[in-house]
Amino acid sequence: MKRIIFSLFIDIPKAELDLFDDHIKKPDAVHTNYNTKNEFQINYQRLVDCKVEYAKSIGVDFKMVEDYTEYYKFFRKNYPEITSYNIVNFFKIHLLYEFGKKYDEVLYLDFDVVPNTNENFFEVWDLSKGICVLNNNERVSPIQKITERTQTIRSPNAKYYNAQAMLIEKGLSPTNDVINTGIVGISKKHLDQLEYFTDFKDDL
């Protein structure tokens, strides 16, 4: 069985960073995205090396992806309303499909993920049973406790209730999970079943 781990680092220009926390940050605080950009640059090599070493320790291929130029151009032309941050997030799902053409099982790790185990992910998690992701449901607050000052558009609360509203609009059950896609383990079979990009334009 062919397996691969990959990660993604796109150094989004500062001018294109969306300041999603502008309404909640203190006047003298640094925007989260500015701080993240700076920390990634400082810790770049360490964050790459830890993933390379982990992949080597469990005997699977590793790929570090750092160029999304063509994908970025495609989105800017066809979906100009989408932020660079969100283009990157769609790009990582696109890459799951690209690697799925060659590999039976794929593990994606966000750039800030640091493997701290010697266990083989692919042996611990049986990807024949489904997609391996973490849900953040425990971080969703009751709607009556949510105010504009307690969340951002990236918070689990926003993701949960926005998804709920869209499900209700389509006449579906509002029950949903808040999925953290910082770590995604998936098989080629389930990528095909997911059909993520099949109705992409309508879903947007």
Residue ranges, per PLM feature:
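Catalytic core and acceptor-binding pocket of nucleotide-sugar-dependent glycosyltransferases
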Residues: 165-204
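A structural signal for short, well-ordered beta-strand segments and their strand-loop junctions
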Residues: 5-7, 61-66, 106-110, 115, ...
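Charged, glycine/proline-rich intrinsically disordered loops and linkers
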Residues: 16-39, 141-170
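N-terminal anchoring/stem segment of glycosyltransferases
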Residues: 1-91, 98-102, 188-189
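Glycine-rich nucleotide phosphate-binding loop and flanking beta-alpha elements
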Residues: 12, 115, 192
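Short glycine-/acidic-enriched loop or helix-start segments at secondary-structure transitions
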Residues: 17, 117-120, 195
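GT-A fold catalytic core of metal-dependent nucleotide-sugar glycosyltransferases
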Residues: 79, 85-154
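Short, surface-exposed beta-edge/turn micro-motifs
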Residues: 2, 129, 180-182
